[in-house]
């Protein structure tokens, strides 16, 4: 039996644009994901978040499912344009009402809310002013954060400033695969810097407004292994770790400087006097959230812009084509403790997409997802034994949902959503996870 510590928080996670639908209802403004998904060619099959899981209308049923599974915590995000349709200025009371109902219902059921302030749905009106590339966004984000802290901070004590800022900056502004769909390396690295400035200002406002809460930030992580013991391959893996994983942001937050290999590559793309902001960026945070899905083998490649390329391995993969490397979650957890020693750590997302089908009996037998989750939770347990101050684990995701540029083609839920009828079916993995929570650990 692999028992977890007393009070360990087992949770499920979602994000606003991925599940809510009704993006313009009740006075909400447009987000960049609304405009991006409505532009032909950006999202597979022309899918949009117009309906998604219709959580905007079915939130009560969805919270009942969380309760049925027995999750102790629910991580969800707030849609910025629901609260501030123009991004700043006038507050939309109906947006506040929607999230107030969710928060109050969770608390009635003894489910701890974890709120993500920004999970990628920037108000479109702010994108028209340059979005994350505009230095002023740090103040816009602080203003938005203040509205949330003042309205919800009396009841919500766990806050996340940003979800996966690397994805916001790089996938949205360098690869152009996510909103706002830009491909400009200067804009991308100015965005990295402005995300850090915005995060720091939000933390500062939090300290003034929410006296007894905790605030942190969430990063995407892959486990990068070198293809050989050659020095240049090891360096390639180190670069990818610094650039793709938590160090890109935690090094500034804890040490006031970007990681060495990132600076070597990107110094010319950062704002000219970026150092002047570093003191302000060094705000103490209460926890670090880590998302983990996959591992990658990398090698030195003189022909690639960053001198790195991926080496495909003969490993099992998920429906996303991501290699399944459970021990990677252990090494990421160990790494963050050794490199930055945060007070508390959470796994804020871990999960997998598979091609789920509903059986004739109306069940979803997703043994592959159970195997994936079990293997990763075992490694998480191992990290706790080795002294990582891990306080909770969140499965991505509660529901099948809008998987960004992949649209509805990829299912990550432990609950199946039939998008034609909006019927929810708890998958075998949902029942399995419910048992893990009940036992506070793995029995087999």
Curated annotation (Swiss-Prot):
Q: Which InterPro entries does UniProt cross-reference here?
A: Glyco_hydro_1 (IPR001360), Glyco_hydro_1_AS (IPR018120), Glyco_hydro_1_beta-glucosidase (IPR017736), Glyco_hydro_1_N_CS (IPR033132), Glycoside_hydrolase_SF (IPR017853)
Highest taxon listed in the record's lineage:
Bacteria
Kindly indicate where the leader peptide sits in this chain: none
The protein's name is 1,4-beta-D-glucan glucohydrolase
Subunit record text: Monomer.
Taken from the UniProt entry, a GO cellular component term is: cytosol
One Pfam family cited in the UniProt record for this chain: Glyco_hydro_1
Q: Which family does it belong to?
A: Belongs to the glycosyl hydrolase 1 family.
Q: How is its activity regulated?
A: Activated by glucose up to 200 mM when p-nitrophenyl-beta-glucoside is used as the substrate. This activation by end product concentrations may be due to a transglycosylation activity of the enzyme.
**Biological process, per Gene Ontology:** cellulose catabolic process
